[in-house]
Amino acid sequence: NPFSFGTFARGYNLNQQEEIGEYYATLGRREGYAAQMAYLGLKAGLINPKTLSADNTEYDLSGDNLERLQTYKIERSGYVNKYNFNFASQIGDFIYLGMNLNAHNINEKALYSVKEDNFRSSNPYLRYANHKQYINTTGEGFSLQLGSIIKVTDELRLGVSYQSPTWYKMKEESRQVLYATTGVATRTYDRDIELVNRYGDPIWYEREYKFRTPSAWTASAAYLIK
């Protein structure tokens, strides 16, 4: 059940007056990602406080945890570019050298969506829920390859090559939206929870990180049959 926010909600205090987006950021720094998800569920009506007292930290699920329709969707678009700069040299008639310098460029946009509807109960309080997470990733990287072939005899060739790691520097921007519909009898209420600042602008959360891929050595041999 991807909307079992009751698991995450223990310990969240109902008494807060900040903007949704700003409080979401503060909650993440203090309590972590699980608490942020519980907060979105609370604002959308997926979980409800057991009491309305300021010090309440106990919540109940709005969903019935019975049969429902779940839809998962992932959309990705973007590109990965690689630019090569090649160099070659020869020493005498028996040593051949080569080098590639590579520049990498990444730009990807992704949408992760989880939707639930068609709840089994005849008159459920929670009618519809759709959590969306947008992630934009950009980055640059560098790598190189070195290689050499040695002509041992007219028939025998020995080779060795080195593939360096690809060193990446990445930047990731993300934002979340939670849409929900709740209702009693024939009356329904739409709750669209978007993370915005006090001026109404969407809030994107940024993080930067570095990583590298493994390196590799390769050896080879060839014998020419005349």
Task: Go through each PLM region and give its residues.
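Outer-membrane beta-barrel porins/channels
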Residues: 1-226
